[in-house]
Amino acid sequence: MFTLKKPLLLIVLLGIISLSLCEQERAADEDEGTKIKRRIFSKIGGKAIKNLILKGIKNIGKEVGMDVIRTGIDVAGCKIKGEC
């Protein structure tokens, strides 16, 4: 019985080592895949997001500028008329 335990133990240990190595390789492959996805999305998505933000800032700047001008004209008109 003792002679059967050694080969069985050896097979189990080799199986565990093999499984561990496969899991490490699988994890490395998944990491590479996510890096590639990140690069693709950062190139495509980064430009799109950047353009959206810039357009939004420009539109907000225009609206704020127009509001300031309107307010300034209203205040100036009020002071000229003496109604303030």
UniProtKB/Swiss-Prot annotation:
Residue ranges annotated as propeptide are 23-36
Tissues where the protein occurs: Expressed by the skin glands.
Q: Which GO terms describe its biological process?
A: defense response to fungus; defense response to Gram-negative bacterium; defense response to Gram-positive bacterium; killing of cells of another organism
Q: Which UniProt keywords apply?
A: Amphibian defense peptide, Antibiotic, Antimicrobial, Cleavage on pair of basic residues, Disulfide bond, Fungicide, Secreted, Signal
Q: Which InterPro entries match?
A: Antimicrobial_frog_2, Frog_antimicrobial_propeptide
State the coiled-coil residue ranges: none
Question: Which residues are the signal sequence here?
Answer: 1-22
Q: Please give an example of a GO cellular component term from this record.
A: extracellular region
- What is the predominant subcellular site recorded for this chain? secreted
Localization per Swiss-Prot or TrEMBL: Secreted
Q: Which Pfam families match?
A: Antimicrobial_2 (PF08023), FSAP_sig_propep (PF03032)
Name the domain of life this protein comes from: Eukaryota
Q: List the disulfide bonds.
A: C78-C84
* Entry annotated with the keyword Cytoplasm: no
Query: Which family, according to the similarity comment?
Result: Belongs to the frog skin active peptide (FSAP) family. Esculentin subfamily.
Name the job this protein performs.
Has antimicrobial activity against Gram-negative bacterium E.coli ATCC 8739 (MIC=3.1 ug), against Gram positive bacteria S.aureus ATCC 6538 (MIC=3.1 ug), methicillin-resistant S.aureus ATCC 43300 (MIC=12.5 ug), B.subtilis ATCC 6633 (MIC=12.5 ug) and against fungus C.albicans ATCC 90028 (MIC=50 ug).
The name under which this protein is listed is: Esculentin-1ISb
